[in-house]
Amino acid sequence: MPVEYDPKTGLINLHNDQISYVIQILAHRYPVHRYFGRYFSKQPYFEPMPSGSHAFANDPTERFPYSVTSLPLEYSTIGSGDYRQPAYVIKDANNQLLPILEYTGFSVNDQPINSRQLPPTVSKHTPVTTLVIHLTDAVTKLQMDLNYTIFENQPLILRSTTLRHHGTTNLQVTALSSAQLDLPTDQYTALTLSGTHAHEANPSFNRLHPGLQTVRSLRGTSGPQHQPFMALAEPNTTELAGTVIGCALAWSGNFDSTVEVDQYQHSRLTIGLEPDTFEWQLKPNSSFQTPEAVLTWTNTGFNGMSQVFHDFSYQLMPSQTNIPSVLNTWETLTFAVSESKVQHLIEHAHQLGLQMLVLDDGWFVNRNGENGQLGDWFVDPIKFPNGLNPLAQQAHHHRMKFGLWVEPEMITTNSQLYQQHPDWVLQYVDRTPITARHQLVLDLSQAAVRDHLITTLTNLVQNNQLDYLKWDMNRHLTQVGSTHLPAAQQGELYHRYVCGLYDILTRLKRACPKLIIENCSAGGGRFDFGMLPYTNQTWISDLTDPVDRATIENGFSYLFPPRIFSNHITASPNAQNGRITPFETRLQLACIGQLGLELNPKQLAPSEQQLLRGALIKYQQLKSTFIKAHFYRLPTTRHVVAWLIVTADKKQAICCYLNGLNSRVKTQHPLPLHYLDAELAYSDSSGNRYTGHQLNTMGIPLKPTNADFTSQLIYLCQN
């Protein structure tokens, strides 16, 4: 039984055979946090909770001889004596703060939350148990459920909060986290991922200190600046070893992840909706569900944490078995696309062995630059006088797929759609609209807007025989107001926008179940666990230089398996940073993910074309074998990155490493692989034989290099 309850002590042990999460119901009143870590096979003994009698603490009462000022509460607020970061702030009809809600019981079931408006986080084949702790406010008749869904076979817990209002007056919710985790020490290093456009997912490691450390987004999306994620690692944790608590949010909008160290060197981690841009009017007989936080514990270092998040991603996402290699038109043609040019590219792609042609930006009316028209999605009759169907048919004739770039959330004022429905955009009353990239944003909270987009996109896909859409979003939200919401509910719009996006993607997938959708927001600007259930792969950055992109992949791999990264071979010198790199490096790095080409095939030398053809054949042969393989970051100071990809049975592996600047000193330094089966014997492509123990500890010999930015892919298999 994954939930054990001791009524004498009030202890609830939520567990599988890997982790335990222990809550105590203190004095039949408040749930407090007692433990999160390795599984307890027997119910542990915990020292009695201290009363917390100290300066500035609330006076204890006979019913509750404790002070909430320092209690490790499961879910708390301000105004009742707890002065730390609140998990929730709710006001009643008198504009007064609700207190810390009191325990009324718990329930257990074998179903996930999987709210219809939020991303589904548990597949129907994944066994889970959900513990629900029920809290209530007797005055307002508000019921609050703290949800804990534990996976049977993973050290993973999903946490969320559900509000159910049984009272008679409106409540105003101004902060509502998905999870709060109170820990008894401050001896942690916080890992976060930060960045910007074309420089995403840079790991930051910072020791906790007194006060607040926060990452957040105010942009309307999760954004490239910060990931909705924070990990707390014990001292001396490495990629290979050490204790880590990882916490991410399955949400694609504004978020807040904060850790606070109080005056007693206790830590509180909260993650959830960003409170400055969130309000919700909770009406009588209504409910509200937060996004889910994804919580894990491991004692096998950052790689161990990543394995849990990767496995979570795989069960979350649509199937990847049908994802084709692609030729994308963007860096070849930009906006200057035409029927004849695309026809030639389809033929070249077929000759090289690529499996799909993607027609990027510029295919629709009045779109010859960034200031062109958005919103109507009509094929440009000048560039494509015969429409897109002949191109789709040409691709399908070669057993290739055909796809388009779209930016459905955006609109320009010169579009027919805007002329007909100016009230469909996000806007403030009596204010001049603020454009970014010459664009306004559609109000996805409106049902009419969503219905229009579903009809438009479904017709676009079906009428043009499309197999794929690259769904882009190239600006963030401003003037987040709606003509269709009353003044008292305008604070709900950031949240309603994201739920509207999920609704559109859900309905589009239902209407076009075989459609491949690539997630993009000027690269990795909306890459989160909220988008994964709706999309097959992600364009992680607009920076295509293999050296910088490898570091971006390395950062994102803390959370996501690189198999879902869309990686394209582009020209050298690189269009974004001017770096010159060997073709082999660009090819090999692109193979660690969903492989594509984004240059004119005529620019490739015959030898490069031959390399690409051979790589595509090998890529397809190994794809099914490695589609859910384990990915590890290998510790190295001698390479830009070093990675190991190992099948579940550890009988096959791929080692990939990327060198930086070349050195005149040609000293060989083997690379330890750490994660192979020590009892197996392996061979590489050249026939060299090694034991797994040898490769794990001594390392694999690496070839000296005579050029900058070289790389190598080494395939290993059991003898």
UniProtKB/Swiss-Prot annotation:
Positions of disulphide bridges: none
Residue ranges that the Swiss-Prot or TrEMBL entry lists as coiled coil: none
One GO molecular-function entry: alpha-galactosidase activity
Annotated TM spans: none
One GO term of the biological process aspect: carbohydrate catabolic process
EC number(s) given by UniProt: 3.2.1.22
Catalysis performed (reactions): Hydrolysis of terminal, non-reducing alpha-D-galactose residues in alpha-D-galactosides, including galactose oligosaccharides, galactomannans and galactolipids
Entries under PANTHER family matching the protein: ALPHA-GALACTOSIDASE C-RELATED, GLYCOSIDASE FAMILY 31
Function statement: Alpha-galactosidase associated with the sucrase operon.
Family that this chain belongs to: Belongs to the glycosyl hydrolase 36 family.
Protein name: Alpha-galactosidase 2
